[in-house]
Every structure is written in structure tokens, then in C-alpha cells.
Amino acid sequence: MNTESLALDFKSATLYAIRVVLHDADTTRLRAALDKRMADAGSFFENEPVVIDATRVDAPVDWPALLQALADHNLPPIGVVAEGANLQGARDAGLVPVELSTSVARAPQVIDTAPPNDVATPVPSVPEATAEATAKAGPQDDEADGEQADEAPAHNPESVPTRAARETTEANRPTATPPQSSSALVITKPLRSGQRVYARHTDLIVIGMVSQGAEVIADGNVHVYGPLRGKAMAGARGDTSARIFTTQLDAELLAVAGVYRVVEDKLDRALHNQPALVRLDGDTLRIEALKG
């Protein structure tokens, strides 16, 4: 049959999403945890598709209330992992059951808390979302390339996330290999609060300060030659070898391939306001001093 005459066709696709892991079925506690996580991360995870993982709770989940809480934070659910009565309840609420698989990439954890000190440990398997977000570099970023500085995946991800541990959750499809990097995107002006720069399929180099409230995101590495006081995410589409480098570390949030840490307290004196790198070691986010 000639498919050119058909009004639709079927194509394979890989979807990535944030896995929201429920540790409690109580709606009040879930909403409070969600509010805190989203407040910590700012706009990092807004508009990222999520898969709800309810396999760790036995008590019945109030699915309509949970879906409303996610909607209030612009987190659209695309599927659920659950068992027994909770699975049926999720179906009744309109959610589609999906299977989670462990693979190369990882997606952001919204509910799980990162341990203290200088490491963040994710929960094993996680989904990723893929869609392109709507936050462009601000007016001062006139040196950013039009295609590379357009939209950040942390907001309408091509990675289902979402804006942290990144393990593929596919919608019944194998994981795609991260694209090859091209020339780095270079920004030579400071980034103010509220500005976001995304380097698609490449590294991001910022020569200047990344202010508190600003976000720098790259599919490859992130280099900040100046104070890093905002949020930084390397390996935005699942590259676990990506790293973050800065000459002065004082960040609000750090993430590599979706494994993230909100920096609520000052880092150790050997790291705070010092040259540092951030990398993944297995499933652990490590922050290390850079020594000459």
C-alpha cells in the first residue's frame, strides 16, 4: 500500500520523563513535598512530562488530588507505574500504565531527597522526557547562536525531565543515543537572574558570572569562567559523561544527566567559592575541587 496517500503513519519514538516516586499516599504530605521540590528547583522542571511511580506505597492514592497537584506545578503526567488497587485507581483517573527500564540515561527525581554533604544519590530506574522548553537566553545573550541557544529540554523535555536521577523510561521503545556535539556555544556576558541559556547538542561556555536565579543548560559540558551562583545542568539529554566546570562554585542547583542536587547549605570550605567540577560517578553526583 502506498503510505504517501494516508493521512497518518506510525513512527517509532523515544520518550523521556521525570519519574515522580511516591513514598507516601497522604495527599497533604505529597503536595507539601512537591511544593518544596519545585520551590527548590525554580522553573527547572516546569512543563516536563512525568511518570508517577506508586510501587512503594500500599495505601490508596487519591489520584485526582495528586494529578491536580502536579498540574498546579505544570507537570503533565503521561503514565503511571503502580500495582493492585492503585493501578486500577490510576487507570480510572485516566493514567496509562507504562513499564520502566534501566538504561544509559537518567531523568530527574522530583520527590526523592538528596543526601547531605557533597553527593546526591538517585533512585535506580527513572524515566525521561523529550520536548523542547521555552526559555531563551535573555537580551544580553546576543552572542548566542540562534539554533543552539533556543530552548532548554528541562522544561519541555526530550528527556520524560523532570528540570533529576536520569534512567530511561521509555514508552515501550529503546533509548536513543545522545546526539553528537558540535562547536561550543560561547556566551561572553554575565547572565542576570531569570535568564536561561541552553546549548543544544553541544557544550556551553559562559565567560562571566551566572547570577542567582539564572540557568545554564547544555547537552554537553557546562563551563563557567566566573562565579556560578545560579543553576547549572550538563548532559541535559542524558549524557552521563558530561561535566560542570566553574572557577567559582556557589550554585543553587547542580545537575548532570538529570541527577541533581539542590545546594541548600553552603558547601565545604574547600569547595565553596572555589574552582570545582561536578560529575557523575555511577549514580552519584560528585562535587570536587579543581586543583592546579
From Swiss-Prot:
Transmembrane recorded as keyword: no
Region (Disordered): 109-188
Organism field: Bordetella pertussis (strain Tohama I / ATCC BAA-589 / NCTC 13251)
Gene3D superfamilies listed in its UniProt record: 2.160.20.70, 3.30.70.260
Function text: Cell division inhibitor that blocks the formation of polar Z ring septums. Rapidly oscillates between the poles of the cell to destabilize FtsZ filaments that have formed before they mature into polar Z rings. Prevents FtsZ polymerization.
Taxonomic lineage of the native organism: Bacteria, Pseudomonadati, Pseudomonadota, Betaproteobacteria, Burkholderiales
Biased composition annotated in UniProt, kind: Acidic residues: 140-150
PANTHER family with a match to the protein in the record: SEPTUM SITE-DETERMINING PROTEIN MINC
Keyword line: Cell cycle, Cell division, Septation
One matching Pfam family: MinC_N
InterPro entries found in the cross-reference section: CAP/MinC_C, MinC, MinC_C_sf, MinC_N, Septum_form_inhib_MinC_C
Stretches with biased composition (Polar residues): 171-185
Keyword Cell cycle on entry: yes
GO biological process entries: cell morphogenesis; division septum assembly; regulation of cell division; regulation of cell septum assembly
Subunit structure: Interacts with MinD and FtsZ.
Highest taxon of source: Bacteria
Family: Belongs to the MinC family.
Name of the featured protein: Probable septum site-determining protein MinC
